[in-house]
């Protein structure tokens, strides 16, 4: 089996060199995220294993959950790709971010390791509301919300008064309870 040793990223078109020295070009469906250990099938039927390459990263740890959560919040606020681990965060090496995280009380260590950031809440890449895919993204977010809450409702009137009401619904096969939705 041949191997691609490449930074794993959500690219539609990817040029890589296999461990055999062979140059290859990949064309992947939009939103595909290659992960370490994935296996691709070449046009000739050959199998190619994906191996995450080592790169300069920051390993972020904290003395407590609150400090690590604050670090994650500030990284997310900057749209920084982050790999979430048990008790640590991993991100691309960036001295400015290392300084910020240290000032927040985190312990930051520079290392060389594979980096596989989270794909995002709804899969695919990072997009903003002005993109052509906003309607598609918004519909997906609404679908996830409706699946979680088991219902949907809308309000087309002014919100300058209280209109509290209850909905009974289930959150899972064994969880049934009244759930209050107070809207202002």
UniProtKB/Swiss-Prot annotation:
Coiled-coil blocks: none
Basic and acidic residues compositional bias, start-end: 157-171
Pfam families: UreE_C, UreE_N
Region of interest (Disordered), residue spans: 147-184
InterPro entries: UreE, UreE_C_dom, UreE_N, UreE_N_sf
Main location: cytoplasm
Molecular function per GO: nickel cation binding; unfolded protein binding
Location(s), subcellular: Cytoplasm
Presence of the UniProt keyword DNA damage in the record: no
GO cellular component term, pick one: cytoplasm
CDD domains given in the database record: UreE (cd00571)
HAMAP family: UreE (MF_00822)
Primary role: Involved in urease metallocenter assembly. Binds nickel. Probably functions as a nickel donor during metallocenter assembly.
Family: Belongs to the UreE family.
Name of the protein this chain belongs to: Urease accessory protein UreE
Lineage: Bacteria, Pseudomonadati, Pseudomonadota, Betaproteobacteria, Burkholderiales
Encoding gene (name): ureE
């Amino acid at each position: 089996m041949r191997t691609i040793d490449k930074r794993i990223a959500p690219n539609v078109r990817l040029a890589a060199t296999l461990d055999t020295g062979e140059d290859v070009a990949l064309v992947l469906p939009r939103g595909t995220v290659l992960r370490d250990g994935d296996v691709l099938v070449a046009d000739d039927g050959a199998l190619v294993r994906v191996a995450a390459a080592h790169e300069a990263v920051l390993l972020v740890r904290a003395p407590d959950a609150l400090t690590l959560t604050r670090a994650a919040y500030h990284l997310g606020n900057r749209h920084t790709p982050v790999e979430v681990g048990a008790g640590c965060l991993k991100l691309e090496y960036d001295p400015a971010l290392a300084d910020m995280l240290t000032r927040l009380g985190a312990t930051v260590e520079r290392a060389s390791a594979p980096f596989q950031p989270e794909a995002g809440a709804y899969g695919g890449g990072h997009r903003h509301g002005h993109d052509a895919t906003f309607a598609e993204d918004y519909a997906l977010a609404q679908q996830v919300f409706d699946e979680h809450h088991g219902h949907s409702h809308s309000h087309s009137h002014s919100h300058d008064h209280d209109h509290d009401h209850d909905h009974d619904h289930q959150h899972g096969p064994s969880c049934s309870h009244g759930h209050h939705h107070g809207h202002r």
